[in-house]
């Protein structure tokens, strides 16, 4: 359990630092679309795709490596990567209805909860 905690902790720290560095390096180029965040999400999507296959095929790898990469590093870098692999897994298995449903659920759910959170905070803080 200790090694699992350390793997997640170190991975998350490194992922968060990379996301921050990408934001510092890229966000000023096109402020309307934070390119650092976009880069973080695209990198995360690619890395989780690789990791999903590697950890499925290389079953002998210690579980701490999966925790380090997926839960820690990608969790710190982005939350978009897990969503991406879940949708693409459905699509690659020919489950296009499920892929669309999962994508729609994540997207609409995220927007709805973001709006709800903004509304709640504005109400608490009495902001117009």
Curated annotation (Swiss-Prot):
Its main location: membrane. Na(+) is not transported, but it plays an essential structural role and its presence is essential for fluoride channel function. Signal peptide: none annotated. GO terms for molecular function: fluoride channel activity; metal ion binding. It catalyses: fluoride(in) = fluoride(out). The chain crosses the membrane at residues 5-25, 35-55, 67-87, 96-116. InterPro entries: FluC. Fluoride-specific ion channel. Important for reducing fluoride concentration in the cell, thus reducing its toxicity. It is a multi-pass membrane protein. GO terms for cellular component: plasma membrane. Coiled coil: none annotated. Keywords: Cell inner membrane, Cell membrane, Ion channel, Ion transport, Membrane, Metal-binding, Sodium, Transmembrane, Transmembrane helix, Transport. This is Fluoride-specific ion channel FluC. The keyword Oxidoreductase does not apply. Na(+) binds at residues 75, 78. It is found in: Cell inner membrane. Belongs to the fluoride channel Fluc/FEX (TC 1.A.43) family. One of its GO terms (biological process) is cellular detoxification of fluoride. It comes from the Bacteria.
């Amino acid at each position: 359990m200790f090694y699992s905690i350390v793997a997640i902790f170190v991975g998350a720290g490194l992922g968060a630092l990379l996301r921050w560095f990408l934001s510092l390096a890229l966000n000023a180029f096109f402020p309307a679309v934070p390119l650092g965040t976009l880069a973080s999400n695209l990198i995360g999507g690619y890395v989780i795709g690789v990791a999903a296959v590697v950890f499925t095929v290389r079953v002998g790898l210690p579980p701490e490596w999966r925790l380090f990469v997926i839960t820690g590093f990608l969790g710190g870098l982005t939350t978009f990567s897990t969503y991406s692999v879940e949708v693409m897994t459905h699509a690659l298995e020919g489950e296009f209805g499920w892929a669309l449903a999962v994508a729609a659920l994540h997207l609409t759910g995220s927007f709805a909860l973001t709006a709800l959170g903004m509304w709640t905070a504005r109400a608490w803080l009495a902001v117009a």
